[in-house]
Amino acid sequence: VNGINPVLEMSKFTFSAPMGNFYVQYMDVLSNGGSQFLIEIGNGNCFTNISFTGCTVREVPRSIIRMNSNDAMAESINIDNCILKNIGLSGYGLLNIGKAGTLNSISITDCTLWEIGDQIIDLRVALSEFEFSNCTFYNNETGIPKMFRLEKQPKMITITNCIFSGPNGGSKVNSGNSDYSGWLSYAGCYVTSDMVIDSREFNDAISLEYTSDDLFIDPTNGDFRFKPELKFDGEGVAGDPRWWAN
């Protein structure tokens, strides 16, 4: 209503049987903390395709989606045009895919990730495709130790046109849980100077000479528009498109 999504305050989504498509669209999904995971798949009662589109999802103690069963048969997980805030602060990360009978693709696109704990994804199954593109990542108070934990290398992986930013709770960050430099590129991505990189660098990313406070209008309060006087090269190209100048 009037550009404001209705608030859905809840514990978790539960599936009592296998189902087809499950779509969450244009909702402000607020976890009440009653469950560690917004969606937890521990058996064959699973979706075929799931998507979050145009949503705000916030205050989930662990993951938005956790899959941990070889009986789970799924095709895709898609998160698009969402703001994801205060997720995974108790561990496990934004997405946690430990086991699955089948899962072909995961995409996170055109999103803002704001205060994310542990990792963006913990992936331990073989995917055909993983995409993380046009996202703005900002951690101010939260220290994320690594962006991605990819125990299984996807057949195709794309991480591009993203901005990784913020002081990260004063902690250093690795691009991955292990050395993925032989097959993982961050080409087209930017890293602000206040995000201090540990031993595993963001391969092919552009390291900026200025901080997130220099780049964004008011990042600590969720305004990730670029400061116009900066004339940032990534304007209209990198990060969540909602923050680009019209």
Identify the role of each PLM range.
Residues V1-D223, L230, W244-N246:
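Extracellular beta-rich repeat passengers
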